[in-house]
Regions:
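Surface segments flanking catalytic/ligand-binding clefts of nucleic-acid enzymes
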Residues: 8-204
Length: 204
C-alpha cells in the first residue's frame, strides 16, 4: 500500500463499544474468547509496534505480558503553567503514559533518523524532564529478541518500584525471569512483530 499518511482520524471503534456489542451477542461462536480478548485490549494504539509493547506491558504473564498498570496511549498531556514558557511543545501525546509513575514511553521508528527528527526528539526529552516526567524511548532494537524486551521491561520495573509496595519488585522480577513467562513472551513477540520491524544484522 502507498499514499499519504493521515493523522488524528477518529477511531473506527473503541474497546467499550466492542465490549458492549459482545454483551449482547452471547450466542455467537467464539463469544467467550472474544470477550476475553476485549478485556485485554486498550484504546489509543497508533502503530503495530505500539500494540506489541502494550501487550508486553499489560497482558497477564501466562500470555507473555508483565500485567503492569495500563498506560494512557496517545492522550494529550497538558504542561504545568510554570513551565509553559520553557517547553518546546505546549502539549504532547506520548505513545504510553503512566500518570502514577510519572513516566512516558515512545517508540522511535525509522522516521526518527534524520537530523531534524533527532533535534525534535531531543526537544521532547527536555520537555518531559522539565515537567517531571521520566522518558523512556524504545527502538526496534529493544524488541529484536525476548532478551532485549526483558531488559527494557526490567528498566521500567526499576523506575516504577518506588511508587509501589515492597513486594512489587520481587513479583515483577519473578515474572521477568520465570521460564514459562519467558517462553510466552517469545511467542507473543513472534506473533506481533511486523516483518518490517524485525532486527537484521545490517541494522547493527
Amino acid at each position: 500500500a502507498s499514499g499519504e499518511v493521515v493523522y488524528d482520524l477518529p477511531p473506527v471503534s473503541s474497546v467499550a463499544e466492542a465490549a458492549s456489542f459482545l454483551e449482547s451477542a452471547s450466542g455467537l461462536h467464539g463469544h467467550t474468547l472474544a470477550r476475553m480478548a476485549a478485556g485485554y485490549a486498550n484504546d489509543g494504539s497508533g502503530s503495530t509496534m505500539e500494540t506489541l509493547w502494550y501487550h508486553a506491558f499489560c497482558l497477564p504473564p501466562r500470555l507473555g505480558g508483565m500485567h503492569l498498570q495500563r498506560p494512557l496511549q496517545n492522550v494529550p498531556l497538558e504542561w504545568p503553567d510554570e513551565v509553559s514558557a520553557l517547553v518546546s511543545h505546549q502539549t504532547m501525546r506520548p505513545d504510553f503514559f503512566w500518570a502514577l509513575y510519572r513516566a512516558a514511553c515512545e517508540h522511535q521508528g525509522k522516521d526518527h533518523a534524520s537530523e531534524e527528527a533527532l533535534a525534535e526528539d531531543c526537544n521532547r526529552a527536555r520537555d518531559y524532564e522539565l515537567c517531571g516526567i521520566d522518558y523512556f524511548p524504545v527502538t526496534k532494537k529493544d524488541a529484536h529478541s525476548e532478551k532485549a524486551v526483558r531488559a527494557f521491561l526490567a528498566q521500567l520495573v526499576e523506575k516504577f518500584a518506588p511508587y509501589e509496595g515492597p513486594s512489587f519488585k520481587r513479583r515483577m522480577r519473578q515474572r521477568l525471569d520465570d521460564p514459562d513467562v519467558v517462553l510466552a513472551r517469545s511467542v507473543l513477540l513472534s506473533q506481533l512483530m511486523p516483518a518490517s520491524q524485525r532486527w537484521h544484522d545490517e541494522d547493527a
